Amino acid sequence: MSAAKIWRPSRGLRQAALLLLGRSGVRGLARSHPSRQQQQQFPSLDDKPQFPGASAEFVDKLEFIQPNVISGIPIYRVMDRQGQIINPSEDPHLPQEEVLKFYRSMTLLNTMDRILYESQREGRISFYMTNYGEEGTHVGSAAALERTDLVFGQYREAGVLMYRDYPLELFMSQCYGNVNDPGKGRQMPVHYGCKERHFVTISSPLATQIPQAVGAAYAAKRANANRIVICYFGEGAASEGDAHAGFNFAATLECPIIFFCRNNGYAISTPTSEQYRGDGIAARGPGYGIKSIRVDGNDVFAVYNATKEARRRAVAENQPFLIEAMTYRIGHHSTSDDSSAYRSVDEVNYWDKQDHPISRLRQYLLNQGWWDEEQEKAWRKQSRKKVMEAFEQAERKLKPNPSLLFSDVYQEMPAQLRRQQESLARHLQTYGEHYPLDHFEK
C-alpha cells in the first residue's frame, strides 16, 4: 500500500515545504467523501479497490511494508548555523524591529530561566523547568500566530507567553504562588495561564491538552471564527493515548489546529531511540490524514515560516497541521532531574556551543549589522535587572489566604467544601503556631 505524498516547495512564506495528505475545502462547510465518489466511478470490483477505509491499488505480490526503506522526512531550514540565509526565496524578510523582538524575547527567557533555576536550588521556590535550547521553537511559532489564536501549552512554552508580552511580574508571582498569582498559589510553578492572552492554563498530566485543544478548534470551526488553535507537546507526550485520540479527532472533524511537537531528544530520561522506532513524529501525520512538516527547531525563521503557512491554510481549509520541530533540551528535564545520569556532558556541550538557537539568531543579527557587542552587553545587563526587579517584588509578596484553597471551582460552594473550609480554619486556629501564617494574607 502506498500513500500519496506531495512535496511542494513554493516561494517565500508559502514554501514551508508541507507534506500533504488530506482533503481541501472551504472553511465551515462539509465536504463530500472521496471514497463515496470512487464507488460511483468504478462499477466492477475487479477494476479498483473500493474498500471505504483506504485508497490503494491491488497487488499480486506478498510484501510487508518495511519502515527502514521509506525515506525519512527532510528537515526544513532557512538559515544555517552561521546565521546565513540558505535560499533567498525562503527569507521571511522580517523588519529589523521584529527580529530584534525575537532575539530579546529569547534572551530574556534565558535570563529568567537562569535566575529562577538558581532560586529553586536556594530553596526560594519549590520547582522549576528551564527552556534552554528550545527558545527558537517558542518565539518563532508565537510570532507567526494572531494574538487571538488560542494556545494550549505543555509545560515548556513560557516563551510563547513572553512573546505575547506577559509581564515578568506575573511569571514570578506564579512561580512563588503569591497574592498576585492569577492561580492564587494553587498550581505548580511554571504552570502559567492567561485568559487575556489566550493561553490556556497548563496541566501537569502529559498530553491531556491535545484532545482538549481539538475540542476548542472544533468549536472555533462551528462558530466560523477566524482563528486557530495551536497545541504544544513534546515527543514523549506523543506516545500517550490522548495524542492518538486528538490527532484522529482533528483529522476526521477537520479542525483548524496546529499540533506543534517539540522533539528535544528526551522524554525526561528516555531518549528518542527508546521511545519509538518510526521516523519521528511528523511521519505519523499522514497516517491520520494530517498535513505534516519537520523543521529545524533551532532555526527561528524556519519555525516562523512553517507556522505562518500552517496557520494560513488551517484557517482557509479547516484542516489540522502537524509541525515537528527538531531541537535539543540543553537543561535538565526539571529541578527534580539530574540529566548527567543518562547523557554525557560532551553531548550537552555540543548542542549548547555548536547549535544554540540564540547563538544562531545573534549571528544573523551581526551579519545584518543590526546588533553589536556593545548592544549585547547593554541588553544582557538590562534584561538581568528587569528579571531581578520582578523577582524581588514577587519574593516580598504574601501568599494567598489558605481559605482560597476551596474557591473558584463551583459558582456556589457545596456543603462538603464549606465543611472542609471550616475544618481547616479551626485547625489553623488551634495549631497556627506550627505554620508560617505570617507569610500568608489574612
Swiss-Prot record:
Keywords: Acetylation, Magnesium, Metal-binding, Mitochondrion, Oxidoreductase, Phosphoprotein, Potassium, Thiamine pyrophosphate, Transit peptide. The modification N6-acetyllysine is found at K353. The modification N6-succinyllysine is found at K353, K377. GO terms for biological process: branched-chain amino acid catabolic process. Belongs to the BCKDHA family. This is 2-oxoisovalerate dehydrogenase subunit alpha, mitochondrial. Transmembrane segments: none annotated. GO terms for molecular function: 3-methyl-2-oxobutanoate dehydrogenase (2-methylpropanoyl-transferring) activity; metal ion binding. GO terms for cellular component: branched-chain alpha-ketoacid dehydrogenase complex; mitochondrial matrix; mitochondrion. It comes from Mus musculus. InterPro entries: Alpha-ketoacid_DH_E1_comp (IPR050771), DH_E1 (IPR001017), THDP-binding (IPR029061). It catalyses: N(6)-[(R)-lipoyl]-L-lysyl-[protein] + 3-methyl-2-oxobutanoate + H(+) = N(6)-[(R)-S(8)-2-methylpropanoyldihydrolipoyl]-L-lysyl-[protein] + CO2. Together with BCKDHB forms the heterotetrameric E1 subunit of the mitochondrial branched-chain alpha-ketoacid dehydrogenase (BCKD) complex. The BCKD complex catalyzes the multi-step oxidative decarboxylation of alpha-ketoacids derived from the branched-chain amino-acids valine, leucine and isoleucine producing CO2 and acyl-CoA which is subsequently utilized to produce energy. The E1 subunit catalyzes the first step with the decarboxylation of the alpha-ketoacid forming an enzyme-product intermediate. It is found in: Mitochondrion matrix. Mg(2+) binds at E235, N264, Y266.
